[in-house]
Amino acid sequence: MFITRWLFSTNHKDIGTLYLLFGAWAGMVGTALSLLIRAELGQPGTLLGDDQIYNVIVTAHAFVMIFFMVMPIMIGGFGNWLVPLMIGAPDMAFPRMNNMSFWLLPPSFLLLLASSTVEAGAGTGWTVYPPLAGNLAHAGASVDLAIFSLHLAGVSSILGAINFITTIINMKPPALTQYQTPLFVWSVMITAVLLLLSLPVLAAGITMLLTDRNLNTTFFDPAGGGDPILYQHLFWFFGHPEVYILILPGFGMISHIVTYYSGKKEPFGYMGMVWAMMSIGFLGFIVWAHHMFTVGLDVDTRAYFTSATMIIAIPTGVKVFSWLATLHGGNIKWSPALLWALGFIFLFTIGGLTGIVLANSSLDIVLHDTYYVVAHFHYVLSMGAVFAIMGGFVHWFPLFTGYTLNDLWAKIHFSIMFVGVNMTFFPQHFLGLSGMPRRYSDYPDAYTTWNIISSIGSFISLTAVILMVFIIWEAFASKREVATVELTTTNIEWLYGCPPPYHTFEQPVFVKV
């Protein structure tokens, strides 16, 4: 019975739960790796060994957090749980494919971990650039295993994307138009389109790298008429949409949380929000070379990518100000979920501002591969994506489990996390402006102070992670059941009870106008 339910599941709620548990577990691994990085950088001198080991840890940290924490939780966890409930569908369009999408991830994770245990590990950075990732600089199976890991994770995401697009387009009740679906449903659909269009390009790039390494092709080797810059174009054509894939479902969740705890029946500027997400999705595909300003692009190419990148600030601004307008004049309930959402809006905006700085190709020449870039993307990921996940988790936890979290503990958890991540990443802006480069395990003494502060901050964040485990335990141990849910008419996922029945609908639902 246990095996039938959890291994062969075709139920969107169970698969969503599996994704959430897998993502939480991977998040622990990713956090452990990040703490190893901060321990190494906590003082000058060597702690763990040479830079190969250090870079293996950095590479694994990136892959684990992106492919096994953020994406499984946001798209697999929240997406599977909420999308069918929000559109009134009995399940996903392809329930068995849904199961396969999940079960491709543990083997993928296993391959990634295996890559670090054989030979010297894949110390390439998450970008896996040749010639460093070639078979001379990285002899042995490590990079090959990492490539296979990415293949599996990519197939998983592509299948999931097909499933979500089909579900959202085809499984709405006849009376529900696309422009009446909740914003989270929109965000997942746009994310799925981005995945569908960008992942095949990554697959092509890493497959060519695989044949360069093992079959003597020369796609990325100038000696045989290849070009390593081609790899960078292929990688970043995936890599830039990927960062929007990581944040867009977060946008959707934040819209729901802000609307709910402002006591509003709908978000401010629904159509503007949809338009903004579609614009961000489209623009995300035509700005990739801003990651490559230092490789010798033509000056007019640099001018184009600078301008195009800055255009993304417009739809992003539409979203930020619409969230603020939703809050405006609302009957605000200061719940932990709203605190996460407010933290998201503030810190994501800071990250966006440093992004505008880096979009300038002339400035990026100086700041590229320094800690300024690390600070920038950790503000939008560690305080954007993660805050959205945490906000979504504490908001929908009663829906998933039927139990409520302890309000005070949850607020304390938010406060500790807020202090921790800011203390970790704010000083890194200063390090970057002073020229401290990324991906080095050691640094000159001049950088010591800010690194010490940053490392202390990382251990404050660790405290928050441990506290979160306690808070979840406390909720299950105390078993405070949900009494009432407000605003159910505009938040239909709550309409079916907390938690909803295993099969939401025994027969198709039709909404009469």
From Swiss-Prot:
Q: In which pathway does it act?
A: Energy metabolism; oxidative phosphorylation
**Keyword Transport in record:** yes
Q: Which residues bind Na(+)?
A: E40, G45, S441
Which residues span the membrane? 12-40, 51-86, 95-117, 141-170, 183-212, 228-261, 270-286, 299-327, 336-357, 371-400, 407-433, 447-478
Cofactor(s) needed for function: heme; Cu cation
Could you list this entry's UniProt keywords, alphabetically sorted.
Answer: Calcium, Copper, Electron transport, Heme, Iron, Magnesium, Membrane, Metal-binding, Mitochondrion, Mitochondrion inner membrane, Respiratory chain, Sodium, Translocase, Transmembrane, Transmembrane helix, Transport
Q: What topology does the record note for this protein and the membrane? A: Multi-pass membrane protein
Q: Which residues bind Mg(2+)?
A: H368, D369
Binding of Cu cation: at which residues?
H240, H290, H291
Give the main localization category: mitochondrion
> Record-annotated residues binding O2?
Y244
Q: Where does heme a3 bind?
A: H376
- Source taxon at top rank: Eukaryota
- Function, in words: Component of the cytochrome c oxidase, the last enzyme in the mitochondrial electron transport chain which drives oxidative phosphorylation. The respiratory chain contains 3 multisubunit complexes succinate dehydrogenase (complex II, CII), ubiquinol-cytochrome c oxidoreductase (cytochrome b-c1 complex, complex III, CIII) and cytochrome c oxidase (complex IV, CIV), that cooperate to transfer electrons derived from NADH and succinate to molecular oxygen, creating an electrochemical gradient over the inner membrane that drives transmembrane transport and the ATP synthase.
Q: What is this protein called?
A: Cytochrome c oxidase subunit 1
Covalent link location (1'-histidyl-3'-tyrosine (His-Tyr)) = H240-Y244
- Outline which residue ranges sit on the Mitochondrial intermembrane face: 41-50, 118-140, 213-227, 287-298, 358-370, 434-446
State the EC number(s). Answer: 7.1.1.9
A GO term, aspect molecular function: cytochrome-c oxidase activity
Q: Where does Fe(II)-heme a bind?
A: H61, H378
How, per the record, is the cofactor bound? Binds 2 heme A groups non-covalently per subunit.
Subunit structure, per the record?
A: Component of the cytochrome c oxidase (complex IV, CIV), a multisubunit enzyme composed of 14 subunits. The complex is composed of a catalytic core of 3 subunits MT-CO1, MT-CO2 and MT-CO3, encoded in the mitochondrial DNA, and 11 supernumerary subunits COX4I, COX5A, COX5B, COX6A, COX6B, COX6C, COX7A, COX7B, COX7C, COX8 and NDUFA4, which are encoded in the nuclear genome.
The UniProt family comment states: Belongs to the heme-copper respiratory oxidase family.
Any matching Pfam family: COX1
Q: Which GO terms describe its cellular component?
A: mitochondrial inner membrane; respiratory chain complex IV
Which segments does the topology annotation call Mitochondrial matrix?
A: 1-11, 87-94, 171-182, 262-269, 328-335, 401-406, 479-513
